């Protein structure tokens, strides 16, 4: 699913609620809790998932992962339950089958395939190396970050952490549980650079113009998929059908 289709999904989310067709009885999908679709997410990953202030002034989950989760649940005739947690918690809960889906801008890394199944790609994105404007001239190319004098960040348990270890093994690599923590470290000068998913980096850059996206980071498996509880073929099929719509 490309970005244009994701945008259309967000605009049509309200329509999808009324138009959704519940799953037929003979196509019943087993879930962690009967009648519910339980989704784990890490709401520090705008524009995928984040906290937004609603009309009553209260924080509520938003983002196109959340719109997609709602669409899938409605299409299956299930109530949506979203459980926020750190990113590594999403991976852990899904691998233990405590939740049905993990939606947190997941990359379908082959190293994760023993712990979960992956849906089809629903958004094609990339990876970026990010710093602040005052330090941008230090990183004219990605190789410049591979220096023991630099502190380089990435989210704990993420593909970005793998990319940091692969591309900057000589640097002081720091893993933090939330992307918001990484952004804070960059802006306060405690961290020199970081590996961040491109759409996420662009989203933070809109709010924090001191951030600078220096370059793209090569990565073979570019794109985001939904993590599905391992072995639940019926659920995986239902998720892929929703993505294809």
Task: State where each predicted segment sits.
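A ligand-binding cleft/hinge motif common to bilobed small-molecule-binding domains
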Residues: 88-89, 106-115, 162-166, 187-220
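Extended ligand-binding regions for polar small-molecule ligands
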Residues: 66-75, 133-135, 143, 149, ...
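Extracytoplasmic small-molecule ligand-binding "clamshell" domains
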Residues: 27-106
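Ligand-binding cleft/hinge of the Venus flytrap
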Residues: 50-56, 69-77, 142, 159-177, ...
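Alpha-to-beta junction loops
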Residues: 77-79, 95-104, 149-151, 178, ...
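Periplasmic-binding protein-like
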Residues: 124-133, 198, 202-243
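A conserved helix-loop-strand patch within extracytoplasmic ligand-binding domains
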Residues: 78, 89, 107-108, 119-161, ...
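Short helix-initiation/N-cap motifs at beta->coil->alpha
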Residues: 64-66, 81-93, 137, 174-188, ...
């Amino acid at each position: 699913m490309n970005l244009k289709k994701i945008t259309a999904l967000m605009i049509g989310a309200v329509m999808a609620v009324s138009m959704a067709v519940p799953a037929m009885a003979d196509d019943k999908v087993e879930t962690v809790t009967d009648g519910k679709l339980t989704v784990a997410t890490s709401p520090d990953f705008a524009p995928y998932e984040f906290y937004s202030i609603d009309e009553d002034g209260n924080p509520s989950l938003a983002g196109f992962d959340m719109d997609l989760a709602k669409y899938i649940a409605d299409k299956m005739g299930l109530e949506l339950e979203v459980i926020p947690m750190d990113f590594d918690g999403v991976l852990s809960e899904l691998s233990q089958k405590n939740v049905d889906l993990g939606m947190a801008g997941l990359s379908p890394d082959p190293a994760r395939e023993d712990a979960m199944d992956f849906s089809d790609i629903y958004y094609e994105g990339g990876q970026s190396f990010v710093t602040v404007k005052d330090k941008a001239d230090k990183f004219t190319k990605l190789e410049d970050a591979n220096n023991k004098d630099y502190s380089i960040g990435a989210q704990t348990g993420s593909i970005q952490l793998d990319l940091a270890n692969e591309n900057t093994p000589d640097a002081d690599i720091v893993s933090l549980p939330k992307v918001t923590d990484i952004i804070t470290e960059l802006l306060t000068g405690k961290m020199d650079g970081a590996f961040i998913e491109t759409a996420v980096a662009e989203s933070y850059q809109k709010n924090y113009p001191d951030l600078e996206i220096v370059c793209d980071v090569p990565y073979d498996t570019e794109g985001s998929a939904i993590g599905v509880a391992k072995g639940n073929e019926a659920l995986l099929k239902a998720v892929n059908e929703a993505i294809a719509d």
